[in-house]
Amino acid sequence: MTRLTLALDVMGGDFGPSVTVPAALQALNSNSQLTLLLVGNPDAITPLLAKADSEQRSRLQIIPAQSVIASDARPSQAIRASRGSSMRMALELVKEGRAQACVSAGNTGALMGLAKLLLKPLEGIERPALVTVLPHQQKGKTVVLDLGANVDCDSTMLVQFAIMGSVLAEEVVEIPNPRVALLNIGEEEVKGLDSIRDASAVLKTIPSINYIGYLEANELLTGKTDVLVCDGFTGNVTLKTMEGVVRMFLSLLKSQGEGKKRSWWLLLLKRWLQKSLTRRFSHLNPDQYNGACLLGLRGTVIKSHGAANQRAFAVAIEQAVQAVQRQVPQRIAARLESVYPAGFELLDGGKSGTLR
């Protein structure tokens, strides 16, 4: 395994260094080839490194940052005032080649805008999309995008997301001829917004895309599709709703029957069932899938949930490691160029169009 260097925006997220720094130490424990650049306020970071041993410290470097982009800041204002911020400096380390990826739990809009500004989109891609890979009930995986990078999406952007998601599913997740679907309010052709119907019409004309039509949100985890495409607003709401339901379900498994008097054998049976069911459904725990890749950039950027705990942020760091090792941007760029050498020129309803 080759050595990797990641830049962490340790000031981002709801909890800042109190979560991100312990998560960084956890990541170092699990990967001896990993070096981390901790970007943020040294006064807030240093006390949290007290438990780090000398070997861990040799693979850590604090990069001082002057400010933090607030989670509630408007993206346009945040970008204009971003110089010296932990988020921008972490991205600049990737741009300069000092780090191979950036991980941040900070303001999504600001991260999207700064990443696009500093790292640039791949040739032919208008706007990057946040993508994650979720488990489904058939014991496989589903690629889902966009998860919040782009609130408003036209049909061109949805088609681009479908292309990138299909390439990611085939090249990285290793799903041959992945099925692609658009998230909609029904499976009928007449359902949905104009942008969704227009994107559907274009996807039907692309031979290299295994487009299967519309899918409803209640089928997200059924395994009916390998790639699910939607606008960022819908994707973000869908993902967080699913995560909330899963957390409630897992919590109920642990707490069911507490405080009630039972005979000893019923208590033993209850505890056995709780442990068995918890193990059975533990793979659905959202913490295990924290970290969405900002797909479509020339560099690797991972967005963690703002409310991520230590375990979840450590998972986001591991997602960055895997994205770098699998050369996600390079493989997507190479595949896009080979499959769409004309710059994604398409025919849409008899009219010449482009996805640039």
Curated annotation (Swiss-Prot):
Protein name: Phosphate acyltransferase
Chief location of this protein within or outside the cell: cytoplasm
Record function comment: Catalyzes the reversible formation of acyl-phosphate (acyl-PO(4)) from acyl-[acyl-carrier-protein] (acyl-ACP). This enzyme utilizes acyl-ACP as fatty acyl donor, but not acyl-CoA.
EC class name: transferase
Protein's organism: Shigella dysenteriae serotype 1 (strain Sd197)
Keywords: Cytoplasm, Lipid biosynthesis, Lipid metabolism, Phospholipid biosynthesis, Phospholipid metabolism, Transferase
Gene: plsX
UniProt KW Plastid keyword: no
Pathway(s) the chain acts in: Lipid metabolism; phospholipid metabolism
Record localization: Cytoplasm
Subunit description: Homodimer. Probably interacts with PlsY.
NCBIfam families documented for this protein: plsX
